[in-house]
Amino acid sequence: MIIAFQLAVFALIATSSILLISVPVVFASPDGWSNNKNVVFSGTSLWIGLVFLVAILNSLIS
């Protein structure tokens, strides 16, 4: 169970880092938002899902 928690936290950190870099690049590029809107929404949905997964796993471990 601890390994699953650690992997979920690592995935959350990796997703956060990727979104931290990619979202400003998408907004700064011309026509970037209209072309990459689905990618940004998918990444944000993945991030929200990982936050809930980490919270659930944390409550099971503690």
From Swiss-Prot:
Q: Which Gene3D superfamilies does the record associate with it?
A: Photosystem II PsbZ, reaction centre (1.10.287.740)
> How is the protein disposed in the membrane?
Multi-pass membrane protein
Could you list the residue ranges that cross the membrane? 8-28, 41-61
Subcellular localization, per the record? Plastid, Chloroplast thylakoid membrane
Q: Does the keyword Transmembrane helix apply?
A: yes
Cellular component GO terms, alphabetical: chloroplast thylakoid membrane; photosystem II reaction center
GO biological process terms, alphabetically, are:
photosynthesis; photosystem II stabilization
Q: Which InterPro entries match?
A: PSII_PsbZ (IPR002644), PSII_PsbZ_sf (IPR036512)
Pfam families (UniProt xref): Ycf9
Name the principal localization, coarsely classed: plastid
Coiled coil start-end: none
Write the record's keywords in alphabetical order, separated by commas. Chloroplast, Membrane, Photosynthesis, Photosystem II, Plastid, Reaction center, Thylakoid, Transmembrane, Transmembrane helix
Its family remark reads: Belongs to the PsbZ family.
Q: What does this protein do?
A: May control the interaction of photosystem II (PSII) cores with the light-harvesting antenna, regulates electron flow through the 2 photosystem reaction centers. PSII is a light-driven water plastoquinone oxidoreductase, using light energy to abstract electrons from H(2)O, generating a proton gradient subsequently used for ATP formation.
Read off the PANTHER family from this record. Answer: PHOTOSYSTEM II REACTION CENTER PROTEIN Z
Per UniProt, subunit arrangement is:
PSII is composed of 1 copy each of membrane proteins PsbA, PsbB, PsbC, PsbD, PsbE, PsbF, PsbH, PsbI, PsbJ, PsbK, PsbL, PsbM, PsbT, PsbY, PsbZ, Psb30/Ycf12, at least 3 peripheral proteins of the oxygen-evolving complex and a large number of cofactors. It forms dimeric complexes.
How is this protein named in the record? Answer: Photosystem II reaction center protein Z
Q: What's the source species for this entry?
A: Calycanthus floridus var. glaucus (Eastern sweetshrub)
